[in-house]
Amino acid sequence: MSTLLIELLTEELPPKALARLGEAFARGLFDGLSAQGLLEEGAAVEGFATPRRLAASITGARRTAPDRELREKVLPVTIAFDAEGKPAAPLVKKLAALAKTVGVEVIAAESLERGPDGKAEALFYRYTARGAVLADGLQTALSQTIANLPIPKVMTYQRPNGENVQFVRPAHKLIALLDSEVIPVSAFGLQSGNVTLGHRFLSAGEIVIQDAASYASTLESQGKVIAGYGKRKEAIRAELLKTAGADTVVMPEALLDEVNALVEWPVVYPCHFEEAFLAVPQECLILTMQTNQKYFALTDAQGHLRNRFLIVSNIATDTPEAIIQGNERVVRPRLADARFFFEQDKKKPLADRVPLLSRVVYHNKIGTQLERVSRLQAIAGQLAEKLGADVAHASRGALLAKADLLTDMVGEFPELQGTMGTYYARHDGEPDDVALACSEHYQPRFAGDALPSTATGTVVALADKLETLVGIWGIGLQPTGEKDPFALRRHALGILRMLIEKPLALTIDDALQIAAASFDGIAAVKPNLAAITDFLYDRLRGYLKDKGYSTNEVEAVVSQRPQRLDDIVARLEAVRAFAALPQAEALAAANKRITNILKKTDVAIGAVQPPLLKEDAERALHQSVVSAEPQVHDAFARGDFTTALKTLAGLREAVDTFFDGVMVMADDTALRDNRLALLAELHGLMNRVADISKLAA
């Protein structure tokens, strides 16, 4: 297969957009050529992206696309000809336009085919479309790809000839190479060739790409450029780990991506800062190194910050002392600022900052952060009472939860809200669980994040999420489609995870009603607890499916809308065990049948009257239900849901016999009502743990 190379050499591209630009450039060219038939079956594309270039290498490119036999609809027959059967004006006009499009002088009406078009008879023109030539097809694909790139911000620059050009950054060279042959295309006033530039400092002069397949290796050997985005990123990761030695690299993927987008020939150097800075909370130091300097912090085996850090340079040298000293010099003022913020913040207790939250607007329809804190205290206090947590500590934790929003450190680094509250609360002598609640009430911050570790933190976290969910929903800002500006989906999932995973003996209704009561007197807030409850159960379904439970298993439990979720996993495991029994399928089908029968009845169903049980089958079923009831109820009371459901397996024979030999909807109303009562009793027993009808195929 032939290899096609396209490279666009530019000034330094925006680091945070480089990965997206590289992917879009490669995919756009591939799709554009594929749509024109210029790629063979099995063709593949490899994208390249560095700070100064976007490139794509496509294997399986064709010089010419195959010809295609096309059949194009012209007009319905009813309007194509006049009364005498001659071509009418619409047909003449259409054929003239079509001839121009196809590239022929004239299309005779006699050359058209007749055939159905699904509605009526129509005229069709059959012709051979010549396959696109690579140069033309590539020009089209390149122009479309450039136009569709996800450019964060366009800049205007001027070519040497005075032409104004708009692109993400000035473009300097263009390569278009099929194997070793230059394909003539253009972009931004540049004509394609086979010449590029290597590293801005480590490579001298132009580099000729002799063959498209050798692009990456030529750039690496001659130009000191690792062109592959992924390859360069993994090289950085490996070098960081190697240089760190026994220490652990604090290496968030976002930082790794950003640094990768800043270098073409990455080299890692170790640096140091004064140990005195370690008196500042390590989260502050790590964040300032990452955010302001793009450095990688190091921690020891216990997770404590070291006074060493790693930098990724774009310069390889045998004498890196100047690079190391320069980076050590610029980080000191940043660390000194963090230390200053920390020392200044400690001078004012968190509790003294709380009244100033009246200056911070939470939402113009709901009020200030101070008003919100008052609601959090009310909610947290009631939740603590219900859950047996320390009410005073919960109220204190809620009072201080948002106070660090007014500190200098959080003003500089908003990501540290909560974290700094814990440090400052401990400095102020607050109980440890109260201090921890300042940070833990934000947990879980994202999917898979840890839950609060303390009872106080859990209660305040629940209060925070419930207040947000009920309040924001209550002013009409519930999630819609892809929009969820207040992260209500995340808050809902956090509530569910705490109820399930802690677990907490708290009903959904109680939690929502406590939160709703805190908004009494705020006219703008109209809590819609029914809609929020539906929303929570929908999120619950997704959470449980992500845990590996099947749709049927989840529906069997969630369709009953259990109020307490502390036993939901046990119910699901019981459903799974029941579904594996040989009797499960028949009982699930029978339960579904019973559900449908009971739905259709419009009479009040009372208790079973044994004297009215006339048939042997119904007497046997009643006896089976009476025998199973105490076992099921006892197992349910113990939380042994598996035993409760497995006990139902013993009913299978009696249920089958009943439906085979007993007419439920008998003409005798007394018999009918008694049989409905028997089915209702059976239905209640079968659905005590879960709605097993949901297991029916």
UniProtKB/Swiss-Prot annotation:
Coiled-coil parts of chain: none
Main location (coarse class): cytoplasm
Catalytic activity, as annotated: tRNA(Gly) + glycine + ATP = glycyl-tRNA(Gly) + AMP + diphosphate
Subunit structure: Tetramer of two alpha and two beta subunits.
Protein's name according to its UniProt entry: Glycine--tRNA ligase beta subunit
Protein EC: 6.1.1.14
Entry's Gene Ontology molecular function annotations: arginine-tRNA ligase activity; ATP binding; glycine-tRNA ligase activity
Pfam families, A to Z: DALR_1, tRNA_synt_2f
Record family assignment: Belongs to the class-II aminoacyl-tRNA synthetase family.
UniProt record, GO biological process: arginyl-tRNA aminoacylation; glycyl-tRNA aminoacylation
SUPFAM superfamilies, sorted: HD-domain/PDEase-like
Cell compartment(s), UniProt: Cytoplasm
Organism (species): Ralstonia pickettii (strain 12J)
Record's keyword terms, sorted: Aminoacyl-tRNA synthetase, ATP-binding, Cytoplasm, Ligase, Nucleotide-binding, Protein biosynthesis
